[in-house]
Amino acid sequence: MQYEPVIGLEVHAELLTRSKMYCACAVVDSTVAEPNRYVCPVCAGMPGTLPVINQRAIEFALRVALALNCEVAPLNVFARKNYFYPDLPKGYQISQYELPLARNGFVMLATAGGERRVRIRRVHLEEDTGKLFHIDGADGSVPASLVDLNRAGVPLLEIVTEPDITSVAELEAYAKKLRSVLRYLGVSLLRQPIDAGGMLKTFTNHLLLKGLCISGGMAMARQRSNDS
């Protein structure tokens, strides 16, 4: 039996705002900034603190939703996505699920086989987590994990497609199209990972488009060899 690849993409794009999603802490490059310097009781998850939403993040998200031909929801609801991990001090991530910011969009891709329509299932806002640094103790020190919360609370825009992508060429075309849209709108440089999922395979932590396409091609080849 010949199977057809079925791929849906879930993209997390860091928004180019000055402050975090739910507090006034500055958004900085966590790879160079002093650890835990840009943190307040809100993004550190202290009891009794209340979030205040970033208006500019909402405006950026609306730009993207309209550019992707989405239906903007008249009512938005934010929810708590609960999980326990050291880089998420609140014990939950503020995200959207049942009532996202926008739904039912699409983008048109120019491929070798002609134009392809990729449907956008949802566009919603959420916050990033902190960052863990692991020390293996190879130099005789005690193994440990260190937490940097500078990135905790940074605005993220999640863009989810329907499983309409069927080849590596379409995968690359969609990723390039979305990246160009976000950069043209001035809302993101798309530095965050692109995750691809569906019936085929899940790829995570791909900062580079080339890596995403290579992983997609390898997963398809593996599936075909298993089916033969």
Please annotate each region the language model reported.
Residues 1-228:
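Basic, nucleic-acid-interacting segments
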